[in-house]
Amino acid sequence: MGCIKSKGKDSLSDDGVDLKTQPVRNTERTIYVRDPTSNKQQRPVPESQLLPGQRFQTKDPEEQGDIVVALYPYDGIHPDDLSFKKGEKMKVLEEHGEWWKAKSLLTKKEGFIPSNYVAKLNTLETEEWFFKDITRKDAERQLLAPGNSAGAFLIRESETLKGSFSLSVRDFDPVHGDVIKHYKIRSLDNGGYYISPRITFPCISDMIKHYQKQADGLCRRLEKACISPKPQKPWDKDAWEIPRESIKLVKRLGAGQFGEVWMGYYNNSTKVAVKTLKPGTMSVQAFLEEANLMKTLQHDKLVRLYAVVTREEPIYIITEYMAKGSLLDFLKSDEGGKVLLPKLIDFSAQIAEGMAYIERKNYIHRDLRAANVLVSESLMCKIADFGLARVIEDNEYTAREGAKFPIKWTAPEAINFGCFTIKSDVWSFGILLYEIVTYGKIPYPGRTNADVMTALSQGYRMPRVENCPDELYDIMKMCWKEKAEERPTFDYLQSVLDDFYTATEGQYQQQP
């Protein structure tokens, strides 16, 4: 595509403010997965109010309106779906959350399309190197994921300044190994972009082409765009209570307290995880209350609930499929055993991010441990199993009579009084950190549940293990404070773990 002009930003200077350094230590990072639950609707922008990343263009009369181009091919499953090929242009007729009604300008057919498979024509979103709605941290995870190498790069939107962009590049440092360098992209008042004020470009596309030919002050020449995995298509429109025959169970993945977990397919097309509930375990009404609660928790660090089957037993709960299974099993596997400490801490940061979301939503998990965290093919961690979670009014929740909970992961006040809060989840998170840094070992090794309860009442805490940094152990001890109110928030834990290695270093590279 051609140049995409910048609209001047008065708040941005063009005098070349110095930028700082953001190294990332030697570790593979996970691929960022865009939140599939976003229902943001993008409306057409009048040409007199173009945004950064758009340009004036005369369109065919037939193309008047919102025109999108396919980033990936899509084969329709339902009669009202519209199939399309990569690069095909379509006119958006109606927007329905994650599914839009569109007309192909090639075939003239109409139907529903997955909105995350397309991008607005003549925007940066059509470029393979542009990653929309991605944080600096997730950009690092994406670039350090398997399949990318030194010279891989992406352009992302600024997290703090709307309409601004940053360039993130994978480099190799003899001391630190694989690192990510970030460069702020500045806008000129009269249009155009620059990283270094000594050379400017009319559009970001021209800037990329220049730095693909020569480093010209960057850490290295830009080579290949960061690999972007094909997104999972949105769940079917209005498919909540689904027919049992629409689910095909393929492979049993495991069994838990309330039933089994299977890999299966919905309508023979969408790979899903299926939790089956043992008959008589709980009432359909109680199950639906839990399922409806879980459905409200939508974040890219939480396993997403898709649908349920409740008309007869066994009850099914349909969630997104995570290829590498539980974090506990992964850590104990050959592959997981090769993961280095920086990546283990990144796992912790991802889990803290998901729990920070739960914290903001005034929920509790009640059973946070490595067995209830799942891992994707690209090593993205997502929190699962909200079967015992409950919305709370006064930040207090009393366990039901006879409820089973894992002693070694549970805070003393929850063990002794049955009261669960987000702060008891923080205690459990500290135990989860122990699981992670020991590659899945059972907490309090050699001690029975009764021994643990007695030891905790006497102020005992697990000692630091050999490969655990002092700073990480300090975080564990914060989580294990006797007084719940003295334990940190998940928001704080996320911020500390996100920048565990870089807290005292700058974020951006000096201008070339």
Curated annotation (Swiss-Prot):
Disulfide bonds: none annotated. The modification Phosphoserine is found at S11, S13, S228. Detected in monocytes (at protein level). Detected in placenta, and in fetal brain, lung, liver and kidney. Widely expressed in a variety of organs, tissues, and cell types such as epidermoid, hematopoietic, and neuronal cells. Expressed in primary neuroblastoma tumors. PROSITE patterns: PROTEIN_KINASE_ATP, PROTEIN_KINASE_DOM, PROTEIN_KINASE_TYR, SH2, SH3. Residues 63-123 form the SH3 domain. CDD domains: PTKc_Lyn, SH2_Src_Lyn, SH3_Lyn. Subject to autoinhibition, mediated by intramolecular interactions between the SH2 domain and the C-terminal phosphotyrosine. Phosphorylation at Tyr-397 is required for optimal activity. Phosphorylated by CSK at Tyr-508; phosphorylation at Tyr-508 inhibits kinase activity. Kinase activity is modulated by dephosphorylation by PTPRC/CD45. Inhibited by Dasatinib, PP2, and SU6656. Residues 247-501 form the Protein kinase domain. SMART domains: SH2, SH3, TyrKc. A lipid is attached at G2 (N-myristoyl glycine). It is a lipid-anchor. GO terms for cellular component: adherens junction; cytoplasm; cytoplasmic side of plasma membrane; cytosol; endocytic vesicle membrane; extracellular exosome; glutamatergic synapse; Golgi apparatus. The modification Phosphotyrosine is found at Y193, Y306, Y316, Y397, Y460, Y473, Y508. GO terms for biological process: adaptive immune response; autophagy; B cell homeostasis; B cell receptor signaling pathway; C-X-C chemokine receptor CXCR4 signaling pathway; cell morphogenesis; cell surface receptor protein tyrosine kinase signaling pathway; cellular response to heat. Ubiquitinated by CBL, leading to its degradation. Ubiquitination is SH3-dependent. Autophosphorylated. Phosphorylated on tyrosine residues in response to KIT signaling. Phosphorylation at Tyr-397 is required for optimal activity. Phosphorylation at Tyr-508 inhibits kinase activity. Phosphorylated at Tyr-508 by CSK. Dephosphorylated by PTPRC/CD45. Becomes rapidly phosphorylated upon activation of the B-cell receptor and the immunoglobulin receptor FCGR1A. Phosphorylated in response to ITGB1 in B-cells. Its main location: membrane. It is an enzyme of class 2 (transferase). It catalyses: L-tyrosyl-[protein] + ATP = O-phospho-L-tyrosyl-[protein] + ADP + H(+). Interacts with TEC. Interacts (via SH2 domain) with FLT3 (tyrosine phosphorylated). Interacts with LIME1 and with CD79A upon activation of the B-cell antigen receptor. Interacts with the B-cell receptor complex. Interacts with phosphorylated THEMIS2. Interacts with EPOR. Interacts with MS4A2/FCER1B. Interaction (via the SH2 and SH3 domains) with MUC1 is stimulated by IL7 and the subsequent phosphorylation increases the binding between MUC1 and CTNNB1/beta-catenin. Interacts with ADAM15. Interacts with NDFIP2 and more weakly with NDFIP1. Interacts with FASLG. Interacts with KIT. (Microbial infection) Interacts with Epstein-Barr virus LMP2A. Belongs to the protein kinase superfamily. Tyr protein kinase family. SRC subfamily. The protein kinase domain plays an important role in its localization in the cell membrane. Non-receptor tyrosine-protein kinase that transmits signals from cell surface receptors and plays an important role in the regulation of innate and adaptive immune responses, hematopoiesis, responses to growth factors and cytokines, integrin signaling, but also responses to DNA damage and genotoxic agents. Functions primarily as negative regulator, but can also function as activator, depending on the context. Required for the initiation of the B-cell response, but also for its down-regulation and termination. This is Tyrosine-protein kinase Lyn. The lineage of its organism: Eukaryota, Metazoa, Chordata, Craniata, Vertebrata.
